């Protein structure tokens, strides 16, 4: 049986590897609101797609120049649907992440393997220890609009652990608090030392 780091990280030791699972940060009332928002937003998008696909011509319009009015509405619908698609993608992905997402980390004798998965589907990326440099907590900037936007509940959130791999920053640990992040980094460093001695 493994140990827990904070409330969201479970670990399990095996003979030649250690596995870590990071669960999403769940806040019940926010998850309910996000679900309602996604359902409402999806309904609005479906109505707009119907109008774009020809429903606008079935509307009875009282105006002097009906064709100009309909052309203006088509432009509005196309612009609206462009924004709608972007936010629909972001919110549905976030909702699926909160409900079914996990981060899997496997530490073995040679490498750290990281996988972000929703319903078990995701891409695993292997990082060899010899190529990993400077694992440290992400330094947040509370005055950054981009970071505020990224950490809104309807978005996936910022990763808490940063490391350098072949001169590129890589990261994992979505929405971990500072204390848990430091404990996770220490845990990983300690386990890597033990596993590398077993070579």
What are these regions (language model features)?
Residues 1-5, 12-14, 26, 97-101, ...:
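Non-transmembrane, membrane-adjacent beta-strand/coil modules in membrane-associated proteins
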Residues 23-102, 182, 186, 198:
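Alpha-helical transmembrane spans
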Residues 15-21:
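Cytosol/matrix-facing amphipathic helices and coiled-coil assembly/linker segments
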Residues 43, 50-54, 135-138, 144-146, ...:
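Short C-terminal domain-edge/linker segments immediately following a structured domain
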Residues 20, 37-39, 105, 157-163:
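Short, structured motif recognition centered on aromatic/hydrophobic residues
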Residues 34-44, 122-137, 183-192:
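A signal for specific C-terminal beta-sheet/loop modules enriched in small/flexible residues
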Residues 173-199:
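Cytosol-/stroma-facing membrane-proximal "stalk/adaptor" domains immediately downstream
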């Amino acid at each position: 049986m493994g140990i827990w780091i904070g409330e969201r990280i479970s670990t399990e030791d095996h003979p030649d590897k250690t596995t870590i699972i990071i669960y999403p940060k769940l806040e019940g009332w926010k998850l309910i609101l996000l679900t309602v928002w996604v359902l409402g937003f999806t309904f609005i998008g479906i109505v707009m797609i119907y109008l774009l696909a020809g429903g606008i011509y079935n509307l009875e319009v009282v105006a002097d120049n009906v064709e100009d009015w309909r052309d203006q509405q088509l432009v509005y619908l196309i612009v609206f649907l462009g924004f709608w698609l972007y936010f629909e993608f972001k919110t549905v992905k976030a909702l699926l992440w909160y409900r079914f997402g996990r981060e899997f980390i496997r530490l073995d004798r040679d490498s750290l393997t990281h996988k972000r998965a929703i319903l078990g589907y995701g891409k695993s990326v292997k990082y060899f220890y010899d190529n990993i440099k400077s694992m440290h907590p992400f330094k947040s900037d509370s005055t950054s609009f981009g970071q505020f936007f990224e950490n809104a509940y309807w978005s996936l959130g910022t990763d808490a652990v940063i490391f350098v791999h072949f001169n590129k920053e890589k990261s994992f640990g979505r929405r971990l608090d500072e204390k848990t992040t430091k404990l996770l980094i220490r845990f990983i460093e300690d386990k890597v030392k033990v596993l590398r001695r077993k070579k």
